[in-house]
Amino acid sequence: MPRRREVPKREVLPDPKFGNVDVAKFMNVLMLSGKKSVAERIVYGAFEQIQTKGGKDPLEVFTVALNNVKPVVEVKSRRVGGANYQVPVEVRPSRRMALAMRWLREAAKKRSEKSMALRLAGELSEAAEGRGGAMKKRDEVHRMAEANKAFSHFRF
């Protein structure tokens, strides 16, 4: 553990179009090699697709999708007496958000649509409805935690 003072969390400024901090954070998660303008174009393109195809408010779809994908519990490895146990632990709110965004990004990348904006739009729409790759990942993590409930007394 470092002995110096704790470094404060950086504040993320809201995105210019919607004024939403979560959208800005998601753009940062999506960004590669510091190319924020490309990430913005992808996210806003996906939001336009959601607006035109679904006729729903894209910001609402995004927040519902994010809330659906957020994990409540996950497993962590804990070594006890020469054996590794997968111990279920509750996920803290900041990590919930980070995992949800990461899973949405990865699920969108794996889709087969032509552009990343189309893939992201499809993934966000499906996640908002409780389907899709990101939801599958969340359910898988929850299943792992449920299966290893017996080891929950090995709390960290």
UniProtKB/Swiss-Prot annotation:
Taxonomy, superkingdom: Bacteria
Keyword Ribonucleoprotein among record annotations: yes
GO aspect biological process, one term: translation
Signal peptide range in chain numbering: none
Keywords: Ribonucleoprotein, Ribosomal protein, RNA-binding, rRNA-binding, tRNA-binding
PROSITE patterns: RIBOSOMAL_S7
Molecular function as annotated in GO: rRNA binding; structural constituent of ribosome; tRNA binding
GO cellular component entries: small ribosomal subunit
Disulfide bond in keyword set: no
Family: Belongs to the universal ribosomal protein uS7 family.
Stored NCBIfam families: rpsG_bact (TIGR01029)
Oligomeric and partner information: Part of the 30S ribosomal subunit. Contacts proteins S9 and S11.
Described function: One of the primary rRNA binding proteins, it binds directly to 16S rRNA where it nucleates assembly of the head domain of the 30S subunit. Is located at the subunit interface close to the decoding center, probably blocks exit of the E-site tRNA.
Name of this protein: Small ribosomal subunit protein uS7
Species name: Paraburkholderia phymatum (strain DSM 17167 / CIP 108236 / LMG 21445 / STM815)
Gene (UniProt): rpsG
